[in-house]
């Protein structure tokens, strides 16, 4: 929690490519809380997932209905704590271990991205690890804004004497060495309260990670991440997105619309209980009408407990007419947010949908029409021992949290003491001025 005082979310030490590790993932969403415990074992690179240094064997799994959460934010601390304890306890019992820390996802807090560039002098010598650390520090030092916390600080690419496109600059001769840095941030209040709920369960937050980023780590093959793809995680209370290009995260965004809003539309449109609306959405939800939808009828239980009230019958076509407008609204917002990606259109050449909201029948076709891109449903890759229930798109974020320790080495964060110097009272532009004076 102390790190958030300086605008930093916790970051974990990368897992050694030569050592095994036990990792616990915690995905606290608006509709469900999921805890997964896995053993990471070093293995030879695979053909599809060449960037993964470890195999992932799931040994523990627990999930429960989320309580005290709204749009990914903590709304009731005690209820959220209780749900987290329940999911963690189930996973620990299955794994036969007691965990002390978790890798935690975050989908709330108005996720957003910014790109920064910086250059330093090398004076004609070869680029060293120290030079890389210097230029990364210069690129990230001025990225904090009041009320925001850094989730990710990732180099997008390097330049040597003004020539970009350099992936690995080590050992190259240069006079000027530059970096393009992608920084993803969130509202500090959303991060702080979610961490507090976890810490009240006597668990340390080892790392906090943006939900769409880890969803991408779970469902993208290496070629997709290299050539450019956008992952859209459609949760209950939020829809978040992440764009990948050149194997790197280059953009994140999110907004507070999701599957729960579809459920509420059904409840209002059919005059049904929320629980019945959720069940109807799960069993019959679709965004495309079929030839028999006008004739196929769905039973809707009465809203009250009065025995005199009778269940009503509605057609599948009526249900589609309620669901489709809201889903179109969500997809149109996704389209507009992706259009703002500075590296568009390369980073969104095709779209992968994850999350519980992606399970509506006909959604890939509707999304392809609205987004103007190839669309598929993303499912976690390379998780051994996973039961069928968690092989679907609804568990992509939790599965990606198990992959994240293998990608943690890509991130840059300054020492906490240095970062604290940038948190004075001068505001954002004053900090930029200070960065300019220090770096040039």
Tell what function each PLM region has.
Residues 221-223, 356-370, 391-392:
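Short glycine/threonine-rich loop-to-helix capping motif typified by GTGT followed
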Residues 104-109, 349-359:
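Glycine-rich beta-strand-to-loop/alpha-helix junction loops that act as flexible
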Residues 240-242:
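A structural feature that tracks compact, well-ordered secondary-structure segments
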Residues 1-230, 248-249, 259, 272-320, ...:
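Nucleotide/phosphate-binding catalytic cleft detector across ATP-hydrolyzing
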Residues 334, 353, 401:
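Hydrophobic, well-ordered secondary-structure elements that form the walls
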Residues 346-349, 379, 392, 398:
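Hydrophobic multi-pass inner-membrane translocation pores used for secretion
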Residues 332-350, 360-377, 406-411:
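ATP-binding/phosphotransfer module of carbohydrate and carboxylate kinases, centering on a glycine-rich
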């Amino acid at each position: 929690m102390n790190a958030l005082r300086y605008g930093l979310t916790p970051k974990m030490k990368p897992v050694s490519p030569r050592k095994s590790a036990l990792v616990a993932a915690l995905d606290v969403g608006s509709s469900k809380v999921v805890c997964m415990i896995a053993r990471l074992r070093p293995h030879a690179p695979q053909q599809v997932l060449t960037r993964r240094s470890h195999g992932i064997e799931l040994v523990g799994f627990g999930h429960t209905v989320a309580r005290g959460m709204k749009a990914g934010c903590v709304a009731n601390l005690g209820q959220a704590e209780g749900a987290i304890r329940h999911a963690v306890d189930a996973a620990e019992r299955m794994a036969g271990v007691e965990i002390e820390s978790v890798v935690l996802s975050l989908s709330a807090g108005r996720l957003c991205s910014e790109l920064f560039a910086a250059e330093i002098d090398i004076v004609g010598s070869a680029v060293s690890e120290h030079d890389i650390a210097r230029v990364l520090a210069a690129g990230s030092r001025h990225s904090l804004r009041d009320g925001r916390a850094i989730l990710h600080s990732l180099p997008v690419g390097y330049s040597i004497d003004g020539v970009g496109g350099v992936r690995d600059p080590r050992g190259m001769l240069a006079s000027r060495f530059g970096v393009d840095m992608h920084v993803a941030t969130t509202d500090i209040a959303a991060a702080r309260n979610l961490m507090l709920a976890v810490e009240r369960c006597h668990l340390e937050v080892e790392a906090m990670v943006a939900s769409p980023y880890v969803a991408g780590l779970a469902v993208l093959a290496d070629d997709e991440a290299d050539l450019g793809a956008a992952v859209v995680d459609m949760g209950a209370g939020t829809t978040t997105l992440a764009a990948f290009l050149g194997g790197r995260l280059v953009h994140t965004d999110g907004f507070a619309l999701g599957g729960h809003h579809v459920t509420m539309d059904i409840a209002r449109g059919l005059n049904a209980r929320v629980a019945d609306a959720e069940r109807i959405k799960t069993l019959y939800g679709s965004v495309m009408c079929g030839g028999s939808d006008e004739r196929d009828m769905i039973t809707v239980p009465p809203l009250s407990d009065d025995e005199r009230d009778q269940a009503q019958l509605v057609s599948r076509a009526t249900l589609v007419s309620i669901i489709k407008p809201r889903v179109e609204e969500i997809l149109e917002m996704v389209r507009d947010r992706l259009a703002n990606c500075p590296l568009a259109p390369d980073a969104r050449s095709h779209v992968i949908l994850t999350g519980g909201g992606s399970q509506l029948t006909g959604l890939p076709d509707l999304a392809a029409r609205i987004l103007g891109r190839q669309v598929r449903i993303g499912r976690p890759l390379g998780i051994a021992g996973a039961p069928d229930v968690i092989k679907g798109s609804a568990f992509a974020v939790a599965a990606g949290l198990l992959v994240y320790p293998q990608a943690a080495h890509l991130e840059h964060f300054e020492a906490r003491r240095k970062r604290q110097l940038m948190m004075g009272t001068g505001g954002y532009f004053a900090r930029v001025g200070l960065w300019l004076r220090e770096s040039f």
